[in-house]
Amino acid sequence: MADRIVLNTISYHGHGAIENIVPELTARGYKKAFVCSDLDLIKFGVTGKITALLDAASFPYAVYSEIKPNPTIQNVQDGVAAFKAAEADCIVTIGGGSSMDTAKAIGIIINNPEFADVRSLEGVAPTKKHAVFTIAVPTTAGTAAEVTINYVITDVEKKRKFVCVDTNDIPEIAVVDPDMMSSMPKGLTAATGMDALTHAIEGYITKGHCTISDMFHLEAIKLISENLRGAVQNTPEGREGMALGQYIAGMGFSNVGLGIVHSMAHGLSALYDTPHGVACAIILPTGLEYNKSVAGERYRAVGKAMGVTGIDEMNDAEAADATIAAVKQLSADVGIPTNLHGILKEEDIQFLAESAFADACCPGNPRDTSVEEIKELYKGLL
């Protein structure tokens, strides 16, 4: 079977990349932008860097800011109504995964109104038309939602997150400018950075991995390992390296899937509103230990990309253990907790395990699992 890789039509990378937004919109004849960004980014002037460019060009726009850190069905429905009221014809989404996931769902429903029930988009969505033309501008180095064919929505009523997979939702243009990430606080930088590392590692060991995705993921692991500590300290080199590393990770995992770490993390965010990156970072070492018996021989390449000393002289078991230790060390260095104490409630484990097993990311895990085994993994994280 042939491998399929879906990416943005155009992407811009590097300092000053945002200067290309208005020219791209005007060249295509668009008349009014729907700016999708959250209140904090507006408050701290990050969104203003883009709206200032639109103002300078006298390009009309409307701002939608009703976005939660774990976007809900209601956020999407309100956004669809706001887009229609604004009479916009394109989307510029500015933010992390929450803003971009919200924008993706809005854009899909506007052009595919038969999917107005957001829940109907879960899984591999059978939409017929591409979403509204979108330019995505990430302000975090982690989710890579600007280059993925996935988005995640929280169902508050059912206390779960669901993943939507749709090649029609990928933004036509990604603008990855490290200057847009410089205002991220340390904690958010660490959490989103570890999310990016989880994308790269899970994508590398997933059942669906292929030669092209392997190339992307190993380079992403290298860039993230070399630059996350610096990015947390807000060094220009660290920010630039992470901006590129997280994007390359997205180029890979979007096309081949993830695994049990993400399936377990989604439930924590839905039930407790735990930041997704923090949940992934805490669970990642446990997931690697769990998958070691099936995918451990692939850990050597991960460890090598992370710069583990002497890994070529180790046997497979030693290399796998050294790789897991390197992941734990990086996580500790950027201040991520080592367990779910204070987050996870024992009485919720059955529900969370069932949700994780049903999650769209779970089938890609290299080791076949069960609700009972996932329950034990959660218990081990208390």
Where is each model-derived feature located?
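Glycine/threonine-rich beta-strand-loop-alpha-helix active-site module
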Residues: Q74-D179
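An N-terminal, well-structured beta->alpha segment
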Residues: M1-Y64
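C-terminal catalytic subdomain
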Residues: V256-A322
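Short glycine/serine/threonine-rich phosphate/pyrophosphate-binding segments
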Residues: I18-I21, K43-V46, I73-V76, S99-A103, ...
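C-terminal charged capping/lid subdomain of soluble metabolic enzymes
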Residues: Y299, T309-L382
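N-terminal small/polar loop signature for handling phosphorylated ligands or for N-terminal nucleophile
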Residues: I42-F115, R229-R239
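Carboxylate- and glycine-rich phosphate/diphosphate-binding segment that chelates Mg2+/Mn2+
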Residues: N150-V256
